[in-house]
Amino acid sequence: MQVSVRDNNVEQALRALKKKLQREGVFREMKLKQHFEKPSVKRAREQAEAVRRARKLARKKAQREGAL
């Protein structure tokens, strides 16, 4: 990952880097990899996340259809 520093503004470059890392999911992955996660726990977590995503998508779709 690469961020250019313009006009010696390191703070702005750090913010841009943090935003890129956040978008890529690096922080979330690091948090998950801090400790070993049993395969059964991982599978359950991923299924719960999928259900959450599906509900969110359905909610957005219903809201969009209600607005039309």
UniProtKB/Swiss-Prot annotation:
Pfam families registered for this protein in UniProt: Ribosomal_S21
Q: Which InterPro entries match?
A: Ribosomal_bS21, Ribosomal_bS21_CS, Ribosomal_bS21_sf
UniProt KW Disulfide bond keyword: no
Membrane spanning residue stretches:
none
Q: Which Gene3D superfamilies match?
A: Ribosomal protein S8
Q: Name one GO molecular function term.
A: structural constituent of ribosome
Supply one GO CC term from the record.
ribosome
Keywords, in A-Z order: Ribonucleoprotein, Ribosomal protein
Q: A biological process (GO) annotation for this entry? A: translation
Question: Which domain of life does the UniProt lineage start with?
Answer: Bacteria
> Which family does the entry's similarity section mention?
Belongs to the bacterial ribosomal protein bS21 family.
Q: Which NCBIfam families match?
A: S21p (TIGR00030)
Under what name is this protein listed? Answer: Small ribosomal subunit protein bS21
Q: Which organism is it from?
A: Cereibacter sphaeroides (strain ATCC 17023 / DSM 158 / JCM 6121 / CCUG 31486 / LMG 2827 / NBRC 12203 / NCIMB 8253 / ATH 2.4.1.) (Rhodobacter sphaeroides)
